[in-house]
Amino acid sequence: WCDHGHMGICADVLLLDEPTNHLDMDAIAWLEEFLINFENTVIVVSHDRYFLNKVCTQIADIDYAKIQLYAGNYDFWYESSQLMIKQMKEANKKKEEKIKELQEFIQRFSANASKSKQATSRKRALEKIELDDIKPSSRKYPYIDFRPKREIGNEVLTVSHISKTVEGEKLLDDVSFTVGHDDKIAFVGPNTKATTMLFKILAGEEKPDEGSFKWGVTTSQGYFPKDNTKEFDNDLIIVDWLTQYSEEKDATYVRGFLGRMLFAGDDGVKKVKVLSGGEKVRCMLSKLMIMAPNCLILDEPTNHLDMESITALNNGLIKFPGVILFSSQDHQFVQTTANRIIELTNTGLIDKQTTYDEYLANDELARKRQIMNMDVDGED
């Protein structure tokens, strides 16, 4: 996707399967504009709600064993489909009440000669009533609810002059910031390697070359790494894998957390090393729920998740009463979760108490971002 200029010349239809995967926010924004201005047909599969809202004029909903087409974007589809189900359920409820009323009349008066005609008429009316067939949805939403064991105090995290170089590349250069007890901080921008390294340092998996950091005495941390390979490089089954992170060792208790993440029945005896990418992410989220920390460090937690799981995670983080440091390339996820934005640029740190949309819309910050993200070695 680096050289797209030729794409629109001869393509009548673009078929795009998860085109935003592995793209950063700037590349996704470029792709959105390209597709909006593309004059021919685009058929796209994506789990990025903001992207679908920006690009799509129609939504094909594959559910209930059929395809239903909706005119409008993702939000319109969601509201319309939920309204349709609600209306069908309400209509069925009214029909069921009518059926009960007719059945009671027939039962009372079918043997009564003076009421027999009325009873016969109601039998005919009863035969004409048909309930709408509401098939169970193929969509399953996990239940994600992070409940800290301990309330967080005012002193959360102080990062002081941290620097880190890896294989000759300076990833972090004199990084300093303080985290408050109400902060939900999104780390954004193209320098994702720097964010990952910072999170590893704060989680105790790496050491800084210079500088230091200090967690408050009331804090407990839960870390979700971008690469979870080593977490599952063992022969444990899912239940045993999760039990090692739980103070309560009762199998029924542990299975309850797996059930929240849609693991059922024999899923619990699967070996973790054979799980899919999405299943491993759901296991990691189960781990965070069962550990119950009051500070979450989440590096690209929506990777490998389906739309329903992303929505559930999004809602769970919005409700979370603790501190969150996270990164994500999902615009809506960042916009609805974060109340503070930090960008680690090539030449320093931008830190703003704001939403992501406000951050992007700020012209002064946009100029600052452009200057600070220039490659200082190859600057024109």
Where are these regions (language model features)?
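ABC ATP-binding cassette signature C-motif
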Residues: 1-92, 146-380
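Flexible nucleotide-interacting loop at or near the entrance of a catalytic core
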Residues: 83-174
